[in-house]
Amino acid sequence: MDATKTTKGAGGRKGGPRKKSVTKSIKAGLQFPVGRIGRYLKKGRYAQRVGSGAPIYLAAVLEYLAAEVLELAGNAARDNKKSRIIPRHVLLAVRNDEELGKLLAGVTIASGGVLPNINPVLLPKKSAVAEEKSPKAKAGKSPKKA
């Protein structure tokens, strides 16, 4: 009977079943990779030192923004009776939302197109029936003479 493989030795070394690793993302309850973002912050040399909470906070902010854009783009796709989100839906979602539009004002979305916008001056006049009634009412009165 080999006891060293089933139980851990002195100081917790050797043998025993390995625990499943728990990532920083799981601990923080996020989907975005906290460890990778932390590595990018260090590698990018944005500062000499990076706090332990910075990658978690940044991952949470990025995850929130991605979820917000995806939700609005999904709504835009559903409005157009489509089941797949395309860049056009992302553009419509971002530009129609006041806060996201301000945040991404200088961003160009490839294959997004433009927002539909027709100047009111170029739109056709009101229907002919409504147009006939209003001029007669005004024409019935004679101008006052001094």
From Swiss-Prot:
Q: Which GO terms describe its biological process?
A: heterochromatin formation
Question: Which residues are modified to N-acetylmethionine?
Answer: M1
Concerning SUPFAM superfamilies, the annotation shows: Histone-fold
Is the keyword Nucleus assigned to this protein?
Answer: yes
Sorted alphabetically, which PROSITE patterns does this protein's record hold? HISTONE_H2A (PS00046)
The cellular location(s) given in this protein's UniProt record come to: Nucleus; Chromosome
Taxonomic lineage of the native organism:
Eukaryota, Viridiplantae, Streptophyta, Embryophyta, Tracheophyta
Q: For the motif SPKK motif, give the residue ranges.
A: 142-145
User: How does this polypeptide assemble, per the annotation?
Assistant: The nucleosome is a histone octamer containing two molecules each of H2A, H2B, H3 and H4 assembled in one H3-H4 heterotetramer and two H2A-H2B heterodimers. The octamer wraps approximately 147 bp of DNA.
Q: Which family does it belong to?
A: Belongs to the histone H2A family.
Instruction: Describe tissue expression.
Output: High expression in meristematic tissues, in cells of the root pericycle and in shoot cortical cells undergoing endoduplication of their DNA.
GO MF terms held by the record = DNA binding; protein heterodimerization activity; structural constituent of chromatin
Which Pfam families does the UniProt record give?
Histone, Histone_H2A_C
Q: Domain remarks in the entry?
A: Contains one SPKK motif which may interact with the minor groove of A/T-rich DNA sites. Phosphorylation of this motif may regulate DNA binding. This motif is reiterated in both termini of histone H1 and in the N-terminus of sea urchin histones H2B, but its presence in the C-terminus seems to be unique to plant H2A.
**Species the sequence originates in:** Solanum lycopersicum
| UniProt keywords, alphabetically | Acetylation, Chromosome, DNA-binding, Nucleosome core, Nucleus
Q: Where is this region: Disordered?
A: 1-24
Q: What is this protein called?
A: Histone H2A.1
